[in-house]
């Protein structure tokens, strides 16, 4: 999977997603720096192929936008910043190999990236072994900042608990108490099903079944037939990426939306864009949304992003990449150092400024477990919407009101002596 590194000039950057087609890329520093200044290197391990390629592309473009801003503002400690990108293909083993290459051979100072929770868990462990700061941009399983929390890891996206708590009450109150889960068979899906089940039991509901589907499944017919026979009030579709697109298309082909409510936790703009109109339905949760007319700086961010993405608007994934790279930069400049422990300590409690937060309620990285506490954007899909107007945000739920405490999540952070 290793493809020889190549530099991306300005013209290819403006090609958006096409610029991330290769497996190993170097995005060079821009700005006015002395030729003798050695760049600060940040390695990004994200999927450019496979089930989550579209989500990975958005995270990468968001990070590139941040990189341009960072270097125009003076970089890190007055040095240019360089972004080195590797394709994880959503394979945990490959992701670790790429991370070790970035740290060992390319000498990156920091790591970031991930869409798959399985990859996040693997990079979480590898970063600890490498004693290198790692920001999990988009792998959600509770364990990353819960029972498997590490001093070297921070996370920008939500936990699965926050995703499920973002719309559980709405689904339960509106659509019924008997649920059936269609669950991707890896850490992300297991974590979502566990979190919804816990809330469902407490509310007096019932799990009628939980069918596991391997990541990368293309034919969901046998799973959907099984769910249809049980006749739940709600089919909770926990798949993601191409799996969500395929499962929703097939569920509608079976007419299941006429027999039960189809809903879920996280949904992404990339997935909605890939679905046919008839498959766009249900109540879900976004983690960030591009249309926030009353929120300062969002319109400017959207306009700038579109110039880098061939006219496409940013998604939550775009914001994950954007905010994560800015956060690393802010922490390093605050620490006035590049060693891992100093930057980690500077990042604990870090509050994103409005032009980076791009949402209300002052998102911050919680010191005790390194989890970003931002907002959830629950709502419903606009079946008759035209891209990118495909989702109605019904509410903005502050993360501070729904996040479990570090103790409840099982995080016991330890630091090197």
Predicted regions and their residues:
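Extracytosolic ligand-binding ectodomains
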Residues: 2-9, 14-16, 23-29, 33-417
């Amino acid at each position: 999977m290793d493809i020889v590194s190549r530099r991306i000039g300005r013209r290819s950057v403006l090609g958006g997603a096409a610029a991330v087609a290769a497996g190993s890329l170097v995005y060079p520093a821009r700005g006015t720096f002395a030729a003798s200044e050695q760049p600060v290197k940040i390695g990004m391990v994200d999927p450019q192929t496979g089930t989550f390629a579209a989500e990975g592309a958005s995270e990468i473009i968001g990070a590139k936008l941040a990189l341009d801003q960072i270097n125009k503002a003076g970089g890190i400690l007055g040095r240019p910043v360089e972004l080195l990108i590797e394709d994880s293909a959503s394979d945990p083993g490959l992701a670790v190999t790429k991370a070790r290459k970035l740290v060992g051979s390319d000498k990156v100072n920091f790591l970031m990236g991930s869409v798959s929770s399985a990859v996040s868990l693997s990079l979480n462990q590898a970063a600890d072994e490498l004693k290198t700061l790692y920001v999990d941009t988009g792998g959600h399983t509770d364990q990353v900042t819960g029972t498997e929390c590490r001093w070297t890891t921070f996370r920008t996206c939500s936990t699965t608990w926050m995703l499920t708590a973002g719309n559980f009450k709405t689904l339960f109150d509106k659509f019924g108490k008997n649920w059936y889960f269609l669950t991707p068979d890896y850490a992300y899906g297991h974590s979502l099903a566990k979190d919804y089940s816990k809330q469902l039991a407490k509310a007096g509901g019932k799990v009628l079944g939980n069918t596991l589907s391997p990541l990368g499944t293309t034919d969901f017919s046998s799973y959907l037939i099984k769910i249809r026979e049980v006749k739940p009030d709600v089919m909770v579709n926990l798949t993601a990426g191409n799996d969500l697109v395929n499962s929703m298309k097939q569920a509608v082909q079976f007419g299941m939306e006429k027999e039960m409510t189809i809903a879920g936790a996280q949904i992404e703009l990339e997935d909605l864009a890939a679905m046919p109109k008839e498959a766009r339905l249900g109540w879900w949760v976004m983690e960030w949304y591009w249309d926030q007319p009353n929120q300062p700086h969002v319109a400017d961010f959207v306009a700038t992003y579109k110039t880098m993405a061939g006219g496409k608007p940013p998604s939550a994934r775009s914001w994950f990449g954007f905010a994560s790279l800015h956060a690393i930069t802010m922490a390093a400049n605050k620490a006035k150092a590049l060693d891992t422990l100093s930057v980690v300590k500077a990042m604990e409690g870090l509050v994103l400024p409005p032009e980076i937060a791009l949402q209300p309620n002052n998102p911050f990285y919680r010191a005790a477990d390194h989890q970003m506490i931002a907002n959830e954007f629950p709502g419903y899909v606009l079946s008759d919407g035209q891209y990118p107007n495909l989702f109605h945000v019904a509410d903005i739920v502050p993360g501070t009101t729904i996040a479990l405490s570090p103790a409840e999540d099982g995080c016991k952070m330890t630091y090197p002596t």
